[in-house]
Amino acid sequence: MAHKKGAGSTKNGRDSNSKRLGVKVYGNQAVKAGGIIIRQRGLTFKPGSNVGVGKDYTLFALKEGLVKFEKMKGVSTVSLDTTSVDI
């Protein structure tokens, strides 16, 4: 039996709280102005029309509308279709 704990065991035993990242509103779903669409670390998804970016890279709706996801040249963008809105 060792009297010392060993190098590995003292460095274990931590766990961080989950950050609740990810897509909050999916494609063709309605969102109100100011509603959060995606929480992310870095610009994995780029903002399109009527979508703003927060200081923590959160994408949010500038107007109410339907969420549209598009991928052009390997870049994923999120935009809002404000023409047909029924919220």
From Swiss-Prot:
What domain of life does the UniProt record list for this protein's source?
Answer: Eukaryota
Q: Where is this region: Disordered?
A: 1-21
Question: Where can this protein be found?
Answer: Plastid, Chloroplast
Coiled coil residues, start to end:
none
State the GO CC annotations.
chloroplast; ribonucleoprotein complex; ribosome
GO terms for MF: structural constituent of ribosome
Keywords in alphabetical order? Chloroplast, Plastid, Ribonucleoprotein, Ribosomal protein
Q: Name one GO biological process term.
A: translation
What's the family? Belongs to the bacterial ribosomal protein bL27 family.
Q: What is this protein called?
A: Large ribosomal subunit protein bL27c
Query: Which lineage do the record's taxonomy fields give for this organism?
Result: Eukaryota, Haptista, Haptophyta, Prymnesiophyceae, Isochrysidales
- Recorded name of the encoding gene: rpl27
